[in-house]
Curated annotation (Swiss-Prot):
InterPro entries: ITPase-like_fam, Maf-like. Nucleoside triphosphate pyrophosphatase that hydrolyzes dTTP and UTP. May have a dual role in cell division arrest and in preventing the incorporation of modified nucleotides into cellular nucleic acids. Keywords: Cytoplasm, Hydrolase, Nucleotide metabolism. HAMAP family: Maf. Its cofactor is a divalent metal cation. This is dTTP/UTP pyrophosphatase. It comes from Granulibacter bethesdensis (strain ATCC BAA-1260 / CGDNIH1). It catalyses: dTTP + H2O = dTMP + diphosphate + H(+); UTP + H2O = UMP + diphosphate + H(+). It comes from the Bacteria. Transmembrane segments: none annotated. The active site is at 92 (proton acceptor). It holds the Pfam family Maf.
Amino acid sequence: MMPDQPATACPLVLASASPRRAALLAQIGVIPALTLATDIDETPLKGEVPLKGEVPRLLSRRLAQGKADTAIRVLREQSDAPLAAPFILAADTVVAVGRRALPKAETEAEARQCLTLLSGRRHHVWTTVVVIAPDGKRAERIVESAVTFNRMTDLQQEAYIASGEWRGKAGGYAIQGLAAAYIRFLSGSYSNVVGLPLFETAQLLRGLGFRSL
């Protein structure tokens, strides 16, 4: 009798080194066979700033598509690639206040700037998910959530900055962590704000024939 095949053995490549996205996929029983760190230029292009609300959507879409294309190229270049024809999943999350896309905070100064802009305001989080099937078919979805921060005092901001939780996070905060104490309202997908909208991701995978969901 063959041993039970674990639900985690999935022919899927995650084009992201984000532990948050890997953890979210695991939540719905999907653990990638391979993860790839896809380093691409995340600088907004001139054509991505035409209309209010369009900036972060276009930026998120371009970056997610770029990550997917990079993953394809890397897999083709690796002669010893462990998977001949996997599904590829790429995603990119952009946090924006109005037309202004916030950075992935890497310094305390960037984190402080983000928190100052977010404090007492509503902002939007866009994640584009791109899935490529083994036969080359593509599907994508852009998901939007709205988040409202309570007004943070200077002392609260400094305490959060001291935690270091913001480092590498889009918009300089993690809703699944200490920042939850300052989230007054959320409209839309919670997992989208963490980094991967699970319902929409599962729909994309199912639609392209991913059999583990």
